[in-house]
């Protein structure tokens, strides 16, 4: 009887412990920390890869005000980002998108293979083991001071072969989780982590998705799913709606809001392509942000043949009218699908 009583007591204690473990929380190092909720926007943000100082000029030229500023930032530069976030805040911008690249940038002219070669200190395994902890911690602290939402697009397009962080999906996942743990430890609760792939439309859908899944760090470490949407022309000329199937695959799989993290098109046929993009977006309320990028493209520079990407929407009346419509469409409340509601990445995580 005594043994039976002890067994019952053990079972009761086990049930209590397991029940406690179901309370939403995050394991950060050796302690549990709750993640504050960030609201999912019911409008679609529009970002421009520009310094905040030039956002107003862009808005005046295009006739629509971006709601988000975006930039690329490489680990090797070890720069402060407070000037970027503080200027955005001063100009009334409450969201920023940062494409955060764990490497020392390689000159484009050296080619893809040189660019993709692993760099000591910046390799996924090095980051997972703490090689960049001091920098990551400082960067997280700077972003935590921003009175708005930071969309952090870490180590993007990992499912390609042109960046050094594409090597070893397992170590990529480890590096990502380690980075997120540091941000949570610092208390940067205003940061949303954006896992952003390349659509690789030259691949068949199933192997493309299976390859991308290898890099997935886990639902507890991702808030939004992103994808590049660039029509280079030449051998890579794709209508906007060609990207839709890839985006829907990602949304069905992960049930998270989508962000088009880099959007651009060749000069030839640009108006038709942009109209197609607008039509696609009107059918996809799960897309919560679009980031317009007309920065010099490594992809265009390193392709055997790409059409003209060196044009500026600010100076092109025909295309800027469509871009203006896309921006204004997003300012209207977007209908939330049941999938989007169920996909809320703002729920506390385990």
List each model region and its residues.
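Aromatic- and acid-rich polysaccharide-binding/catalytic face
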Residues: 64-74, 212-238, 293-295
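Substrate-binding cleft of extracellular glycoside hydrolase catalytic domains
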Residues: 80-195, 292-293, 309-314, 323, ...
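Substrate-binding cleft of secreted/luminal carbohydrate-active enzymes
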Residues: 34, 38-52, 261-349
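Glycoside hydrolase catalytic-domain groove-lining segments
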Residues: 84-101, 221, 227-269
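Boundary/entry segment of secreted carbohydrate-active catalytic domains
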Residues: 28-77, 345
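Aromatic-lined carbohydrate-recognition surfaces of secreted/lumenal glycan-active proteins
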Residues: 183-209, 255-268, 289-292
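Distinct, well-ordered alpha-helical segments
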Residues: 201-220, 270-277
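Acidic (Asp/Glu)-rich catalytic clusters
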Residues: 57-64, 80-98, 105, 139-147, ...
